[in-house]
From Swiss-Prot:
Homodimer. The gene is cca. HAMAP family: CCA_arch. This is CCA-adding enzyme. Mg(2+) binds at residues 54, 56, 107.
Length: 416
């Protein structure tokens, strides 16, 4: 039995799985009588994975009611229908409901009914056209090929188009399978990818500038892969190359290996948000803060090894790994050659100045700050109310899986 066959046995849902989700979907749809309510997403397309316990139900309104109706009145209508259930309000382009029924998560999403994927008023409006395109281009074998690709992406950590992950969406996995034909062919091509990667199921109706470009077959002005970061493209390409050479179930279900040592000095920053917020909004700010911290730490004179972030919309951890937290108060500042314009300015601005053997002027400059905690506090900012707790890592929390990944660096699938 091949690796793919073994994996399919683990990820292909059976009749019992399907019946369980169908029962929940029927309960929700029964409350939406009188509305144009439809099951959408991977469950409808037949590309969902065993163990996935979420269903997308879209409630379509006439496009004439407009976006404002979805933002205000539709939510009130839906809450009234489901107020006796365990629900929460979530936000994307407009609010929607998340229901929890028998350990199944149901997203009830209002959208506008449009004539084609190019007539979108909100991003959710395209969904039925995506569903139709995928279901008309994939047979049952093709759906299994998508399942393999999704699980492979999950296993190597590049699955999910949300801002936190910046990876491949389920729809992109489906389009890749349709474009190349099957899971193996996707990987065979991906191992040789070099940005910009242009995969045209349809001709694009505008130019894209992202590293991976897959125009949406239902709206060719849109790049379906715009969310995928260069890092995740690199990880997927490298993992594809290694899998083709040495197939292993490790790519799909990686072994959790504990980190054994702390290399360098690591400052662990724990950010707690006082109010609940939208995860995409939080993580958009997290990554901006990470970039800001990178620049500030390097500018301050620390040798930065790595910086990583993990968590959710309530608690975020940022790990800063540097070679040494103790740096000198002064540093060598290289100036111009003696015959270059700017010598006078350099001498005027610096106190400890001398001429080097190479004919350049040099000076000693005092660092503005040598305390990394203060640098972090001065550069960390969020729109939400938050608190910060910082500790220098002296021992490894055995329960923090993401910390172990950060410390270990090398993923388990990266065989030599």
């Amino acid at each position: 039995m091949s690796v793919e066959e073994k994996v399919l046995e683990l990820i292909r849902p059976d009749d019992k799985d399907r019946e369980r989700l169908e029962k929940v979907a029927e309960e929700v749809l029964s409350r939406l009588k009188g509305f144009d309510a439809q099951i959408q997403g991977s469950f409808r397309k037949g590309t969902w994975l065993k163990g996935d316990t979420d269903i997308d139900i879209f409630v379509f309104y006439p496009k004439e009611v407009g976006k404002e109706y979805l933002r205000e009145k539709s939510l009130k209508e839906l809450i009234q229908l489901f107020q006796d259930l365990n629900y929460e309000i979530a936000f994307a382009e407009h609010p929607y409901l998340i229901l929890k029924i028998n350990n199944v998560e149901v997203d009830v999403v209002p959208a506008l009914k449009i004539d084609s994927g190019e007539d979108v008023i909100t991003a959710a409006d395209r969904t039925p056209f995506h569903t139709k395109f995928v279901t008309t281009h994939l047979d049952e074998k093709g759906k299994d090929e998508v399942r393999l690709l999704k699980q492979f992406m999950k296993g190597i950590g590049v699955y999910g188009a949300e801002i936190k992950v910046k990876g491949f969406s389920g729809y992109v996995a489906e389009l890749l399978t349709i474009y190349y034909g099957n899971f193996r062919k996707v990987l065979e091509s991906a191992k040789t990818w070099k940005p910009p990667i242009k995969l045209n199921l349809v001709e694009p109706k505008r130019d894209f500038d992202e590293p991976l470009q897959i125009p949406d077959p239902v709206d060719p002005k849109r790049n379906t892969a715009s969310a995928v970061s260069l890092r995740n493209i690199a990880v997927f390409s490298l993992a594809s190359k290694i899998f083709i050479e040495r197939p292993s179930i490790e790519f799909f279900f990686p072994t959790e290996i504990k980190a054994e040592e702390i290399i360098g000095d690591i400052l662990l920053i724990k950010v707690e948000f006082k109010e609940k917020s939208v995860e995409d909004i939080i993580w958009g700010q997290v990554w901006k803060n990470v970039e800001k911290l990178k620049n500030a730490i390097k500018t301050a004179g620390f040798s930065l090894i790595d910086i990583g972030a993990w968590g959710n919309s309530q608690t975020v951890k940022i790990a800063v790994q540097i070679e040494d937290k103790n740096i000198s108060r002064y540093y060598l500042n290289q100036g111009p050659y003696f015959y270059v314009n700017g010598v006078d300015n350099f001498m005027r601005k610096n106190k400890y100045v001398w001429v080097g053997e190479d004919g350049r002027l040099y000076s000693l400059k005092k660092r503005r700050e040598t305390n990394l905690e203060k640098i972090v506090l001065n550069n960390l900012s969020f729109k939400e109310n938050f608190s910060v707790e910082m500790t220098w890592l002296s021992e490894i929390n055995q329960d923090d899986k993401e910390l172990h990944k950060f410390l270990r660096k090398r993923p388990t699938w990266m065989q030599t």
